[in-house]
Amino acid sequence: MSIRDLYHARASPFISLEFFPPKTELGTRNLMERMHRMTALDPLFITVTWGAGGTTAEKTLTLASLAQQTLNIPVCMHLTCTNTEKAIIDDALDRCYNAGIRNILALRGDPPIGEDWLDSQSNESPFKYAVDLVRYIKQSYGDKFCVGVAAYPEGHCEGEAEGHEQDPLKDLVYLKEKVEAGADFVITQLFYDVEKFLTFEMLFRERISQDLPLFPGLMPINSYLLFHRAAKLSHASIPPAILSRFPPEIQSDDNAVKSIGVDILIELIQEIYQRTSGRIKGFHFYTLNLEKAIAQIVSQSPVLSHIVNESSEEEGEDETSGEIGSIENVPIEDADGDIVLDDSNEETVANRKRRRHSSLDSAKLIFNRAIVTEKGLRYNNENGSMPSKKALISISKGHGTLGRDATWDEFPNGRFGDSRSPAYGEIDGYGPSIKVSKSKALELWGIPKTIGDLKDIFIKYLEGSTDAIPWSDLGLSAETALIQEELIQLNYRGYLTLASQPATNATLSSDKIFGWGPAKGRLYQKAFVEMFIHRQQWETTLKPKLDHYGRRKFSYYAGDSSGSFETNLDPHSSSVVTWGVFPNSPVKQTTIIEEESFKAWRDEAFSIWSEWAKLFPRNTPANILLRLVHKDYCLVSIVHHDFKETDELWEMLLDQA
């Protein structure tokens, strides 16, 4: 059924949800479990993102098709047209239709740069803007697809948009073109400034359409760092009144930040609904593949809580399957029959023995999380049925053992998180790219012609004289200052460092440099470094040195652009390098170095060398240099396991012997 028709048929307020295709197979399986739980929130539809230039095409199509066929919720697949061949567009639309998907969100996507721009011009692609894609779908497929488009309450920005002001009035002209071309609904970019959205909504109703479905895009605040990161990527302003609710003393406390963030989103929804007199009745959540904050928002929101209440009324308050306290009757088992989740008040010795354990080399730690095997998890009770909607919502909110297990990855952790998490990877979910415009890239990094020029770029980043490199625009963390000189020396020697951290032992969670998580905790870190190194330098110098020490002291992963991989660890191994111990809480892990995530990042990291090379014409010195690095260098990740010896990793790397 089309989103347009569903919208007009639904009288009461509702939500919709965006997901992105995870980078790993286990992440995808865990995401499907999560999406099944979140259907209890009765979303009108879900959307699945499409990577720039079709970089996630196969994963997007697979996830969207699986969701359409198994969730009983209409799926809307994103489709970007810029830098995407017409054949890919046609194939995607045909596969969507055959899978039962009838809703498409037509987007332009990131504009091509460098060689891609020249190629797109020479090929005379029919798709330069989203309006071209809308028009093409409507002309080629008629009413087979309900087509949505994006809107920008604060105005659209290209890259860093140097020297350009965001202008929503200017963007309204383009939005009107998309609607006139046949767009059936509109979803906005994320925002936190309600006044700017309400102004935009009035303009939209006055100048474009009185009744076209318009969905405000909302992103829950899961951590302070990623709150700012998401706002920066989306060019969304943050009102001072919201910023003031996150004083410095709580910014590293993810639980406190999330709690305040839930309150803020509830207030935004309430204000939008009231001040539009209910014209805005659907709220689109950018989930980041996470569930806890959204379930809490829906349950506590005066506008949306009827969703939860109606679920309880439909199922009957006396159904034991609907009570979270009785979920011991609904164990979750893996395909081998292992009980990995159990909410009984008294855990039996047998169950304790069957729980899975992990270790951090010298210290064995029990992790309270849902671990998915290669065969996946399933919910079972005596009747073989799923838990009730009320129970599923309670789980998504993080209540009980099942809830804690289901939301074990609830804080986005980027590419150094657990690759089993649906949220593993970049927070935008759109694939690898240089997240600045061409002009900004040239301003930041110039035109590198020699390896010495590349060293200078990495060193300037470490010195703070430039705030980004092609792989990261987040800037440096405070703890990097503790190993700044060592990292600079490594780069002088040709070890181009991408990521690193110093070691620490039992540091307070309130520490101004290392601090994170709830109060009164103790934090631990192993030193690690990730870097690009010439293959010959790796094979003749660094690898023999690491092999000499052995994997109990130093472990490593290494790979190159051809897909090669080597390690001194056992297959499918991992190392937790940052963890915290907090009162009345299981051990929390925030940084993990593991084989599967390394391989996924290896491919992305080398693709960024190629993207950087495309900024320069073929066969120019800069283009040749960057392509040679792509071809001749390795990516190496090294972990030092004795976190009490805080200097040993850096001494080993800088030792000339």
Swiss-Prot record:
Assigned EC number: 1.5.1.20
Binding locations of substrate: D110, Q189, Y286
Reactions performed catalytically: (6S)-5-methyl-5,6,7,8-tetrahydrofolate + NADP(+) = (6R)-5,10-methylene-5,6,7,8-tetrahydrofolate + NADPH + H(+); (6S)-5-methyl-5,6,7,8-tetrahydrofolate + NAD(+) = (6R)-5,10-methylene-5,6,7,8-tetrahydrofolate + NADH + H(+)
Keyword NADP included in the entry's annotation: yes
Active site positions: E18 (proton donor/acceptor)
Pfam families given in the database record: MTHFR, MTHFR_C
Positions of transmembrane segments: none
Names of the cofactor(s): FAD
Annotated binding of NAD(+), by residue: E18, F19, F20, P21, P22, K23, T49, W50
Record bears the keyword NAD: no
Annotated disulfide bonds: none
Keywords: FAD, Flavoprotein, NADP, Oxidoreductase, Phosphoprotein
Biased composition regions of type Acidic residues, renumbered to the chain: 311-321
Annotated residues for binding of FAD: T49, W50, H78, R108, G109, D110, Y129, A130, Y152, D171, K178
BP GO annotations: methionine biosynthetic process; tetrahydrofolate interconversion
GO MF terms, alphabetically ordered: FAD binding; methylenetetrahydrofolate reductase (NAD(P)H) activity; methylenetetrahydrofolate reductase (NADH) activity; methylenetetrahydrofolate reductase (NADPH) activity
Pathway note: One-carbon metabolism; tetrahydrofolate interconversion
Positions bearing Phosphoserine: S120, S301, S358
Region (Disordered): 308-329
Family assignment from sequence similarity: Belongs to the methylenetetrahydrofolate reductase family.
UniProt cross-references to PANTHER family, sorted A to Z: METHYLENETETRAHYDROFOLATE REDUCTASE (PTHR45754), METHYLENETETRAHYDROFOLATE REDUCTASE 1 (PTHR45754:SF1)
Protein known as: Methylenetetrahydrofolate reductase 1
Organism annotation: Saccharomyces cerevisiae (strain ATCC 204508 / S288c)
Gene name, Swiss-Prot/TrEMBL: MET12
